Amino acid sequence: MSMSDPLGDMLTRIRNALARKKGKVVTPASKLRARVLDVLQSEGYIRGYNQVDLGDGKSEIEIELKYFEGLAAIREISRVSKPGRRVYVSAKSIPHVANGLGISILSTPKGVMADYEARKQNVGGELLCRVF
């Protein structure tokens, strides 16, 4: 059975693992997932991730979640643009998350990046998710 929203699946796995206070979570690998995880790691929301080759052309990503004094670094993570309803924004209309305390992750012609980077480079794109 094919998965209709691979990125949404990864975000749900992260959300569920954080609710159960897990240290790591495993998800199937893809380039988009890896780029989103790069942004999450650079912003300090996860400790890191590594890609594990399973052979036969398949691989998984093992994500190390981050906690501080028993609380998850990610309070809320949600998908914005979905397969049935894509959400595109211009550089001037990129929303602020929690008055600037959180970030939006966008897929732009210049790559996957956080909202403030897209504003700085004056580029819009598909609004993938919000993290707070």
UniProtKB/Swiss-Prot annotation:
Keywords per UniProt: Ribonucleoprotein, Ribosomal protein, RNA-binding, rRNA-binding
Superkingdom, natural source: Bacteria
SUPFAM superfamilies in alphabetical order: Ribosomal protein S8
Signal sequence, renumbered to the chain: none
One Gene Ontology cellular component: ribosome
Keyword DNA-binding attributed: no
GO MF term set: rRNA binding; structural constituent of ribosome
A Pfam family hit: Ribosomal_S8
Coiled-coil segments on the chain, per record: none
PROSITE patterns named among the record's database cross-references: RIBOSOMAL_S8
InterPro entries the UniProt entry points to: Ribosomal_uS8, Ribosomal_uS8_CS, Ribosomal_uS8_sf
GO terms classed as biological process: translation
Family, per entry: Belongs to the universal ribosomal protein uS8 family.
Classification via PANTHER family: 40S RIBOSOMAL PROTEIN S15A
Subunit structure: Part of the 30S ribosomal subunit. Contacts proteins S5 and S12.
Family annotation (NCBIfam families): PRK00136.1
UniProt function note: One of the primary rRNA binding proteins, it binds directly to 16S rRNA central domain where it helps coordinate assembly of the platform of the 30S subunit.
This protein's name: Small ribosomal subunit protein uS8
Organism phylogeny: Bacteria, Pseudomonadati, Pseudomonadota, Alphaproteobacteria, Hyphomicrobiales
